[in-house]
Amino acid sequence: MIRKNTKTVNPARFQIEDLGSTGKVPTTFMKKEGYPMARVFNFGAGPAVLPVEVLEEAQKELLDFKGSGMSIMEHSHRGKEYDAVHAEAIDNVRKLLKISDDYTVLFVQGGASMQFAMVPLNLLGAGQTADYVDSGAWAGKAIKEAKLVGNVAIIANTGKDIPTRMPKNEDLKVTPGAAYVHITSNETIAGSQWKVFPKTAAPLVADMSSDILSRPFDINQFGLIYAGAQKNLGPSGVALVVMRKDLADRVPAKVPTMLKYQTYIKENSLYNTPPTFGIYILALVTRWMLKLGPEALYKQNVDKAARIYAALDSSAFYKGTAVKEFRSDMNITFRLPSEALEETFIKDASKLGMKGLKGHRDVGGIRASIYNAFPVAGVDALVAFMKEFEKKNG
């Protein structure tokens, strides 16, 4: 049975000594928090932390899936055992996003990077223009791919703004008759996030790889959303696509079979062998989300981010890199007074079992990625460490 773990640690009582100095969080502390063994707090941007409850369930079923005598990795994707997993994964996503029959749920290999090409290949017709918002590195990658396919208009550009931010909705200069409008809901490198999605006449398309199912939103506002699984949904290797069915009719005739959304719709994402184990874990993760409850998960995500931002805002030693209005709840980015101090911060945190805090290689600094499954205890550990580090080095 997948269990909930929503315990928190009072930062005022949390001591750095609780973490030890072995590079893992001690078993005694982890057991107190409801975990079975010593583990690290994984602040990595992705592949990212998974719920321990899910890992335990997968471990239990790894050799013998539901009494079948085989691992789910060994089962045929046409068999009844995997069919039940596939159906649950789709059903869970539908429930979490409250998806109507006007939309289809697809699982596609190639991650979100494949979607950078598939979206324009399927939705951008000859002579049409696709509108893109350049909000940072990941939006830039989507734009680069779309330009290989057809006409692209950049309708807002905050990609190089310092401090980092998203554009305001009123600043979007949408092209009349645009095939679609593409946004990136959360920029993991920049640490910025859309808080209110724009309303557009053209179908709104969003790369939600790093904040999918972290907060409530109306799926009916979008023509298509996509997300690589490895941050909030499961392991790498599969992308979730949710799209309005009528948009699949736009696809030009010469798009290759495996790049057509119609192929995945007609074959229930089973045209070829899908990443069965990745979809199995996705089914477990979304089951965990349903048990916890989307609203409770959202409140916990906001609370986790608020704790770290409060530590940043109360300090002259640390400096956040994103405009407050657009701060990400998933990826918290900040700087220290010098790169040397940042290197020491990362090294010392790692010794205490806090891994993955190094900022992206293109921008440096510190990045704490606290996706859905990241425990509150890890946030409180980081805050306690930040205060201790400032005392010693400020």
Q: Predicted segment positions?
A:
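Conserved PLP-binding catalytic core of the aspartate aminotransferase-like
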Residues: Y318-A349
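Active-site phosphate-binding strand-loop segment of PLP-dependent enzymes
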Residues: A146, N157-I212
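A glycine-/small-polar-enriched, mobile loop at the entrance of the PLP active site in fold-type I
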Residues: R39-I90
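Conserved N-terminal alpha-helix of the aminotransferase class I/II PLP-enzyme fold
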Residues: M70-Q115, N122, A137, E145
